[in-house]
Amino acid sequence: MSDARRGASAPHTARRSAPLDGRRVGTVRSTTVARETGGRARPHDEGRGVAKVGKDPWIRPLRGTADVRARVVFFPHAGGAASFYAPFARRFPDGYDVAAVQYPGRQERWEEPFVTTVEGLADRLLPSLRRWASEPVPLVLVGHSMGASVAFESTLRLGHDRLTAHCRLVVSGRAAPSVTREAQEFDSDQDLLDHLARLGGTDPAILSSPDLMDLALPAVRNDYRAVTRYQPVPDAVVETPVLCLTGDRDPQVTPEEAAAWKSHTTAGFRLETLPGGHFFLSDHQDTVVRLVAACAEAGDR
């Protein structure tokens, strides 16, 4: 789902929520009813076989390796969860340690209160990311839509700590921080659901189920409001290479808005345009993984 510039007006949201790429069933366990699994429900056990370093609620391991040559951390879109990136993790070559951020208020963190700002998410994530950024292996932060903003803010914070020597940033489906756009407004939940349906990326079975949407909408509303409140510094720059991925039919990002990311790095910049709309990456998983891996292994900064 997209992160719209304006959240739907709604009363105070409940803490219990499930992402649009997964549903809560009875207990704290969840099952994935994701587009990438063909709509089949299964337990969210994507981290099996992964060598975990402690129990960090912010980072869900998706693929581990004994001999790490690079690490990748995915940052989900608004309303999304770590499980969305499990199919991507399986496509990386040997030697890649792959994980995804798990925002509070969804899946195994459903009892935790939401974080209501993009900046707050980056602040809370920083201790977890510091550990990996301090190690002498490439670390690629990959964010899609709202996740691109969280990844960018996280990279800025790592830079303040002088921990970006081995970092790379991949932003996807998101206009550059220097771009100003008119806020999108949704007067009702139905308007928001219609918007999500147009963008794709959400299983139609979930969108058409009132019960599932009751679980998913609190996270969606929270994240959309976070994006609406986000006020990036227009001239902020990171000292890491930036790869920008965009869909050639993405209604949320124009080619010029994607290319504007070039002004937000003092290192290398590359723009890759792929066929598709806002969720183009779901249809090009192998290509996205190849581009991210190439970014990790590039020697130049």
Predicted regions and their residues:
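Domain-scale detector for complete catalytic domains at protein termini or as standalone homologs
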Residues: 36, 44-142, 146-301
